[in-house]
Amino acid sequence: MKAIYRDMCPNCRGAITDERLAAKNPCDACLDEPISMDDYFQLVTAIRKALKLKGVLKEWEEIYALNKEVKEIEELFKKATGFTFWSAQRSWVKRIIKGKSFSIIAPTGMGKSTFGAFMSIYFALKGKKSYIVVPTTPLVVQTVKKIKAMMEKAEVKVNLVYYHGNLKKKEKDEALEKIKSGNFDILVTSSQFLATRFDELLKDKRIDFMFVDDVDAFLKASKNIDRSLMMLGFNEEIIKKAWEIIKLKKQLAKLLQNESGNEEVEKLNREIERLEREIERYKKENKIGILIVASATGSARGDRIKLYRELLGFEVGSGRSVLRNIVDTYIIPEKSMEEHVEELLKTLGRGGLIFVPIDKGIEYAEQLTNYLKSKGFKVELVSARDKKGLELFEKEEVDYLVGVATYYGTIVRGLDLPHLVRFAIFTGVPKFRFSLDLEQPTIYRVLGLMSEILEFLPEEKRTEGEKLYARLRRLIRNIPQYELMKIEEALAEGLELEGFYNHVLEVFKQAVEFLREALKDEEVLKKIAENPFLSLKQIEGKWYIEIPDVRTYIQASGRTSRLFAGGITKGLSVILVDDQKVFNGLIRQMRWRFVEFEIKPLGEINIEEVLKEIDRDREKVRLVLEGKISEQVKDLVKSALMIVESPNKARTIANFFGQPSKRRIGDLVAYEVSIGDKMLTILASGGHMFDLVTTEGYHGVLLLEKGGKRYFVPVYDTIKRCRDCGHQFVDWEEKGVCPRCGSRNVYDALENVKAMRDLAQEVDEILIGTDPDTEGEKIAWDIRNVLSPYAPVIKRIEFHEVTRPAILRAINEARDINEDRVNAQLVRRIEDRWIGFELSQKLWEVFENYNLSAGRVQTPVLGWIVQRYKEFTESETDFLGLTLENDITIILEGVSGDVQEVYVKEVTIEEREINPLPPYTTDAMLQDASRFLGFSATHTMQLAQDLFELGLTTYHRTDSIHVSNTGIEIAKEYITQEIGEEYFAPRKWGEEGAHEAIRPTRPIDTGRLIQLIRDGIITLPRNLTKDHFKLYDLIFRRFMASQMKPAKVLYERAVIGTPYGEVEIEGYIDVIYDGWSRIKPLPLKKLPRLEKDQILKVTEIRKWRAPKVSLYTQGDVIALMKERGIGRPSTYAKIVQTLLQRGYVIETKSKKKLVPTEKGIKVYHYLVSKYKDLVSEERTRQLEKLMDMVEEAKANYQEVLNELYEEILRYVKS
């Protein structure tokens, strides 16, 4: 037993040990002896039986009932379909049992429609009404067939009614009559039927279970959203209130963006809360049905869809996966394109798409098709005008399709055949081609070209272009493609449009004019011609620019790699390179979008092995589609819950895998995505949820006896925070009331625990992805403990950067909790509590002030600041500043006379190599951010936390300077492309350990990062401030410099003689080789060349008095902490922050120097006079080492706690 948690017993809600929780058992008051079994459901059943026998069965019944009902439903499913549930289907059933509505995003073959059809039968057998809405008549027929087949197999009868256009008149009349009178258990119609017949037939019907298959067709009439809500039991008044909330939230978002006053924000928040309470009351008083919206690739747009969020607690995602499992390759052609394609088809076999670049167009596509046909290949050309090839390909009557590589091309987007498409061939790099006068511009191409050439424009023009670009991008964000085409036509034909679209047209026109103007500038064209990523060509006397069309490449190659039930099919892409510069541009842009992207010459890959893997996946897909799923495929797709601390981290991770669907669970938002082999729900816990209590044991720690030895057990309860006064506490004085201000508006982390327990019951496994340090491990341990009884499997995942590859790797390498790290954190927290409480109470007694506090680490640090201040005040002296005729400045100390001239007494000049510094550790980053940017330690740590959570830099709490292979690759790519290959000098910088140095996660500098965010290529869940970019720039430059060759300078050291003594100066005369100084300034002054015995006239004299010793900045104090072994990367900033918060130290406004206050000086002197041995620097350093030893399993944490306890008894209690 390591700890006790109050109120966490899953049966009686009493106190329970960590051991009992981890063993998935109730507390020892409920069960005398723990029960253990391998099978989760058997364990739950056995525990229920034991609790019942003892007469203490309470909340455990809910865990049992849920699992039992799933088993029963699964039995029926097995009877009806012949299969057991997929893991994902089991999750969906659990949600339905709990009465939750949700959106299903699942790949092909996950049995969404089967599930919807089956659940409607289940509800019918319970005497409840179901309604299934599908997009088309054929699907109505198919669904009805499915339901009838299941009824027959399961030997059940329910009243099934359906309507579609192919019914005979008599059948139609009968169906309409039954619908009108509500004489049905299950109703199946198209979404068109719901839209047109709602008022006359469906408005007054109440539905218990509604299943919408294919959200896109359903949303064609956005009022279908209101219709579905009314059928589920909401009235028009409540829907209006939800609509009001949506509008208010939009206003609120605007206010927050403009950083408007608190009053308005408060007012809106109060109004939203009032409406939300009314909706909740309505839902409690009325029976509301369950809605499931299924979608493979839904792209739900518009505000109306948000009604589901406000009334049913979920948002529809898009399900569009951004996962690629593609082997990207290229060939530099040595013969004609046609011959290369012919050769490839012979090697690669059937199932290929062949894309012709847009500059070659449909004529070349026809020519290529005819050539391939003449060589005996079964191939068809597909275009917007002629799509019959698609059908032939689907029926496997042809083996290949040829089309033009454009973003909205028929075979670029309209093809989802994971079992047939094996590879894609590009007969040229997908590209945009523009004539310099921009004939027939389209909006996306104009944006693409602007994005590429803005960096070549003079600053004023660039700023104007950036504003125009941002405006046009913002305006078209929610405009569908067919409307954009109308705007483009209007520009081409010189027409006007109505309202908002005319405004868009005007901005589009300005953008086109801006580009035409820019492309007349000779200087700009020269820069384009020199650029390695764009192509400037003259064709038939006319100049053209070509830029890569990366969106089309992603879409087109993506046809070969689709998400299906069991993973992501492997695909192959081959580019025949027709333009090296555009190809370079394509690679660069792919790397910006996919950190893990790499492309190899086709000859370098093992083609036989790749084709084997491709065919193995196709076989799996066929089995899934034909319903012949072997059990092993079924187990491939698990439902999992990933828990991280912050909403930013959760959103960043979710966005790696497509546009997630969202659900509200209590105060938390859960994001859902499919990552191939997992249906992943991602949730933010909000960080620490538990802390030591204050009302039990010795300051929250029980002292027990075990085998004649003292044993310490901390008692934890959930953290509470008052929303009105901000006070944070653990123990209630009066339940639900803030002990400081009396407010009842108190947040309790218990709410988060309940929400997490609720979600935990839905999944097969839980993955805890808290920060990779002792603090993160302790949070993970708490989460593991309190969720354990609710889920069969819980694992810890650890990642040091938030990137897609790192997350996927972490999931594959999931481990158990590291108990040693937890022990170290337990010791740190208990020590902090004991010392803090004991010494603070002494301070309260002596100074009669309850705001005072003391801690072991902060005391020596306060001492340094007090001592430095003393030296500062005692060291005032005269200074004489001399500016010499060659602009050198020298300063003489303790002198106040006059000087006319000085001479060069000694001079040495030599060539010197200057090595770069290693990449940042936490302390070095805090020092530099303080020195160069004027940031406080807390501000820097918050910015670094954001950059880490948004996936831009690696974990920021580290004392390692080691660089991983991934880091070296990133540096290589950036330095080679942007500075020059000859500058790259890879360095590992030290041994590999648990952590890595702080570095960027991609080869993207600050200017490029700003551009990629502006262009929407990198989308972040929150906006970055100027300070974020400044810190990113500091980290980026320091890291890149650390991977570059040394700089070589002509170094000069000189001794200057004056009437008052000598002054030494050093610096460099010249740079011989710039090396890393290309990216970061040298840490030396530039000096003129000096000669021995040279006489130099003084041109200016300044005199002043000042202290010799300067005060510390936050950066200086942190450097000292590191040097003297006090504090750790996770505590540096907190220690300084505490001294400032307590008012022991203040920071000067302009120079940010630290000055102790009178209170601080008194507290320090009192503590040192009374408890010197307890708070000395030496003892603090020893303790830090002890905690490190606990973490490394070299010391027993109970023994360390005992030592601490004895020490406190000795020094304080006595």
UniProtKB/Swiss-Prot annotation:
Q: Where are the zinc fingers (RG N-terminal-type)?
A: 1-37
Q: Where does Mg(2+) bind?
A: E645, D771
Enumerate the NCBIfam families for this protein.
rgy
Please identify the protein, giving its name as recorded: Reverse gyrase
The record's cofactor note says: Binds 2 zinc ions per subunit.
Q: Which organism does this record belong to?
A: Pyrococcus furiosus (strain ATCC 43587 / DSM 3638 / JCM 8422 / Vc1)
Q: Which terms does the UniProt entry file under GO BP?
A: DNA topological change
Q: Give the UniProt keywords, A-Z.
A: ATP-binding, Cytoplasm, DNA-binding, Isomerase, Magnesium, Metal-binding, Nucleotide-binding, Repeat, Topoisomerase, Zinc, Zinc-finger
What positions carry the motif DEAD box? 213-216
Q: Which gene encodes it?
A: rgy
Q: Which domain of life is it from?
A: Archaea
Higher taxonomy: Archaea, Methanobacteriati, Methanobacteriota, Thermococci, Thermococcales
Q: Does the keyword Isomerase apply?
A: yes
